Amino acid sequence: MNKNFIIAGAVILVLGLAIAIGVTLSSEPVAAGLPEGETTVTGDLLPEFAGENDDNIALGLAAPIFSAPNENSEIVSLEKNGNAKALLFLAHGCGYCQKEVPVVQGFIDSVGVPPGVDVIAIATSIERGRENYPPQKWLADEGWSETQLYDLDREIGNAYGLSASPYWVFLDKDLNVVARRTGNLPADMVGALLIQLGNQ
């Protein structure tokens, strides 16, 4: 057999394998290891969080309605059920978020969630390779006991005006904005806000 033919055949075989491997790698899901499911958002978007002036901008606005997967890939929707909502947006690679979760969970463990309030953690700004990936393992390790949803493409965060994490959005039972806050909140402030929310 011609030596050049053998070499050419080997080159073609190697190239074929390389292409096959490349296709396999490039087609690997970006969200591998994360909960699966479609995220949807409807309604008008909230303006970006405006710091100290935010209450003058966002107070009373109707919140966008969303659906997203929980840690078990079950789709959960924000809906009116007679309870107010405390939405906590978290980024798994954010040091401030890593401090906030045990503070909030500590309050829940010691005092409990006030009647008439649903606390929902929303993992957003999810990036493979950053600390605490995948975020559902991080929240499990922290003992998070409340609803947790996964904003895989940051659609919900963008709709709610997220500019920094951790980011709280408090909604009344009609799903209108009561307050928005960002940064680490101490346990007593978290408790006061949740109690105030439940009393509305």
Language-model features: locations:
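N-terminal targeting signals for export/organelle localization
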Residues: 1-63
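A short beta-strand-turn-helix
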Residues: 57-58, 65-86
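Short, small/polar residue-rich loop motifs at catalytic or cofactor-binding pockets
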Residues: 62, 83, 163-165
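Short active-site neighborhood of thiol/selenol oxidoreductases, capturing the structured segment around
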Residues: 76-98, 104
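Hydrophobic beta-strand anchors of alpha/beta hydrolase catalytic cores
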Residues: 86-87, 119, 168
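Structural microenvironment flanking redox-active thiols in thiol-disulfide oxidoreductases
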Residues: 98-142, 152-159
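Thiol/disulfide oxidoreductase modules built on the thioredoxin-like
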Residues: 140-144, 152-198
